[in-house]
Amino acid sequence: MRLLLIFTVIFVFYLAILKRDVNAQQQGIDSEEGDAETFFNRTYSAHQSDLEKRIFRGYDIKKRPVKNASVPTVVDVHWHVIHVSINQKEQTMTLHGHIYMRWYDEYLVWDPKDFAGIHYARVKKWQVWQPKIRVSNSASGLASAFDFSTSAHVIIQMVEKDRAKVEMYPTFSIKVGCMFDFGDFPYDQNKCSVNLFATDTMAEVQLQNLYNIPPTLSFGWEEQKMKRIISDFKILNVSASQFYYGSGNVSKTAPVTGFELGNTWSMLAVNVDFVRHSPYFWSTIVAPTLVCTMFIQVSFFAPTVSLAFVINLMAIYLEFMFLQDITIKIPLYLSKRPSSITLFHILLISNIVSAVFHGVLCALCSTKVPVPLPIRKIYAVKDYVPASWKEEGMVVDYACDTNWTEWTRTARPLAGLAMFVYFVIMFILYLVVRI
């Protein structure tokens, strides 16, 4: 009985001691008395604060992040374009998106073991050294400070013992002047570029395209991510290129010697190729033109000359209405007259000539002026007309017929046939050769 009492006392005291040891081990993140999330965040925040104090102690944002001044800082650049806006009247293009820049900093280094294994630090853009970049063809001017956002987060990653990788991803909205040529309207195809350069020479800063990857395009979300049609234009391709400016010349060959590096600037370009997207051109311009052409043709086969003259006037009125629509749509800058406008002008002039022709005939038919002998030779055509087509009482001696009414009855169908052949040739040239 005494032995059982001793074992009971020992067992009770042992459980109390064991529970105390377990509670002592669970203090911290797994403690039942504290909030694990709050404890973890407070610790991470504290480590981040200590890390920023450490890496920015004595850091100079105006000094290039290399310990050897003779070594240039290489900045990798990648473009992410989310929208393109083209203004054909102002001859400008506006590019919106994000620009990714990456370089290595030899001063923003730390040992992750001293800061709870932290390998990343997120800081403000103004806290670190960054390359000074400008857009050479910016519509706001060469020294514009509004092309790139002034606020952007920077990620610092400790990748090596003696240097850290710095990544910056600011947004941009760049408006540049372009040289558009719409001489092939509505089949015109143009190209415009955004030229980026660093204000420091290549002896200090060198820009280059990240792994030669072309710009990323995201003009929409989900189903619209492959969208390429914006307003009146279709984006054909967006590419990136690199070239060098030095001694007043532009070259694609990189400099080699130290003297050349000290007098050359690296430049990057985003090239946007686009073509006009005009799906309604045929229905709004070509189709009405064909209708006017039919009016011209019908006028030559109208029963009376006066009716033909009225048809011509109506066609001229319609063409002037369509001409106003074309004038509104066509761009202002043209190196040559577009083939579509040339064709429309030909049809308009042909209609005016047809109206004058029928107007003169209408006036002559109401007079007793005889038909001049030279143009009476047109009656010879009737000799080739089948007998079944000839009307009763048709004059046999055409040389003696001086009646303008009879002459117009023969001349108008011939003129209409000649006009038809002329129109067919013009349309074929427009479709095949595009005058």
From Swiss-Prot:
Residues 1-24 form the signal peptide. The chain crosses the membrane at residues 298-318, 341-361, 413-433. Glycans are attached at residues 41, 68, 237, 249, 403. The keyword Nucleotide-binding does not apply. It is found in: Cytoplasmic vesicle membrane. GO terms for cellular component: cytoplasmic vesicle membrane; neuron projection; plasma membrane; postsynapse; synapse; transmembrane transporter complex. Keywords: Cytoplasmic vesicle, Endocytosis, Glycoprotein, Ion channel, Ion transport, Ligand-gated ion channel, Membrane, Receptor, Signal, Transmembrane, Transmembrane helix, Transport. It comes from the Eukaryota. PANTHER family: NEUROTRANSMITTER GATED ION CHANNEL. It is a multi-pass membrane protein. The keyword Membrane applies. This is Acetylcholine receptor-like protein cup-4.
